[in-house]
């Protein structure tokens, strides 16, 4: 009970204390409000007093100037240190005007020095003054900036001071910089990566990400390092007189590049060439086996790049059998097709890190079991096939998506008895059904893939040795020459044919060795090229001459030239030899680029050739009769 009563008493005391605090606070608030009201009342007459006093001072000054003194004592007696003045702070403050003049009242000094009474002439009572401490505050004048077209320049003294300061500061900077660099060096030393172990290094080197990066980056670096620019080239043409001989030679045939790789192509025979339809600078070459390197793969296909001056192939592909033919998949820019000596068709993909084929055909009776010298992709973007023919006369049609079995196969047999040993094949321009083939027996055959007369239809005789190359006319123009084709043979000749006549139209007999390959220009109707076993490249323009080549060049070392291939533009020829080298020749503009009348001129040339052939046949018949 006693605890409860004490608690109640304590609460009562606290309540009383709170009530007292509230009352005192309320009383102080009322006093403050009263003082504010009084100050507001006094503020208005002060302004009037100040105006009145100002006028009075002016009057006194006027009287003094006239020699009349005022009643007010000019110099009051000094106040004693003990004198005290009582007054309102607000009134004391109001006496200080803005310009530092005295207040607006007349002062009357009392005889008693201890007190000073201020009597207001306006009828106010005496005010007590008190000593106050004044705080002096300086306000800088407002800066006025005027934006005019005048030139504002600082004084030279300020500039010199700033320059002196700038000259003095760098002297102290090196020490501070060295101090800052020390901790940074410590941080760099601490952030150094740890030393990799041999196992970790091997793991990184064999990772797929590193292989992709290394393969891609080395190609780019190699291209950059291989570029050569002629910094002395003169665009004004002043040096053309000196180069006149070179320019004349350039109008015919001039060596541009030579591709050879010590490991992959040296001591190998170039068996086939093909330019990429999508990337005109890429050239694929297939190679036979290297007898001096039995541990290397027998078959190699290299993709060379004409765009960059590097000496190594862009891609290296290989397989376990010698590659006898190769071609870019016409509608697949990443695929390369190869025909091998074992009879397999292989497919490489440059998107894969593998150098070995991503697909291959089986070695079975359903596919090829003899060397494949002919592969070609025919058709359109949405409907195309890979056509391959082996030396046993078997033709297969494949889908590039599935090489496990052919879509169609056919035995090329003449008159149901004689199997054709095909060595070369060519399709006319724009035709995917009819084609011509050359054989080991020296005969040429026309054939078709489909229809009532599928297979071999006609035989053309004229060569006295195996046919090494055959090519149909491909230059498109106002006149259709797709019925014409050329053949090259071991009998040292090149022959011109028409599928409308089973006898050759003309025989070009300027060579003195095996002629290994022949090909029409893709842009000029009357121009073709051929290569022989003595290392000679010949260009024939039938509109100019049919007896001797228009241009001819011999390769250094006179290696046997096995294959040639025109570029799509008709301005370059790629030639492969028996030593694994590929020579790129530039064809001069005067030869390579056809004029507008070349097609009509070639028609007249063919008419003359036919007339001469008929005359020769009549003459031969007369001699036989005699």
Swiss-Prot record:
One GO cellular component term: cytoplasm
Region of interest called Disordered, as start-end residue ranges on this chain: 20-108, 142-197
Biased-composition ranges, Polar residues, are: 82-99
Location in the cell reads:
Cytoplasm, Cytoskeleton; Cytoplasm
Predominant location: cytoplasm
Q: What is the top-level taxon of the source organism?
A: Eukaryota
Q: Which InterPro entries match?
A: DYNC1I1/DYNC1I2, Dynein_IC, WD40/YVTN_repeat-like_dom_sf, WD40_repeat_dom_sf, WD40_rpt
A single Gene Ontology biological process assigned to it is: microtubule-based movement
Q: Which UniProt keywords apply?
A: Cytoplasm, Cytoskeleton, Repeat, WD repeat
Question: Which Pfam families does the entry mention?
Answer: Dynein_IC2, WD40
The UniProt entry annotates WD repeats at: 265-314, 318-358, 367-408, 417-457, 462-507, 510-550, 556-595
Bias (Acidic residues) occurs at: 160-169
* Knocked-out gene: effects: Morphant embryos display defective craniofacial patterning, microcephaly, a marked disorganization of axonal patterning in the head, reduced number of axon tracts crossing the dorsal midline, and increased cell death.
Looking up SUPFAM superfamilies in the UniProt record yields: WD40 repeat-like
Q: Where is the composition biased (Basic and acidic residues)?
A: 20-43, 177-197
Q: What does this protein do?
A: Acts as one of several non-catalytic accessory components of the cytoplasmic dynein 1 complex that are thought to be involved in linking dynein to cargos and to adapter proteins that regulate dynein function. Cytoplasmic dynein 1 acts as a motor for the intracellular retrograde motility of vesicles and organelles along microtubules. Plays a role in the development of anterior brain and cartilaginous structures.
Description of how the protein assembles with itself and partners:
Homodimer. The cytoplasmic dynein 1 complex consists of two catalytic heavy chains (HCs) and a number of non-catalytic subunits presented by intermediate chains (ICs), light intermediate chains (LICs) and light chains (LCs); the composition seems to vary in respect to the IC, LIC and LC composition. The heavy chain homodimer serves as a scaffold for the probable homodimeric assembly of the respective non-catalytic subunits. The ICs and LICs bind directly to the HC dimer and the LCs assemble on the IC dimer.
Family (UniProt): Belongs to the dynein intermediate chain family.
Q: Which PANTHER family match?
A: CYTOPLASMIC DYNEIN 1 INTERMEDIATE CHAIN 2, DYNEIN INTERMEDIATE CHAIN
This protein is called Dynein, cytoplasmic 1, intermediate chain 2a
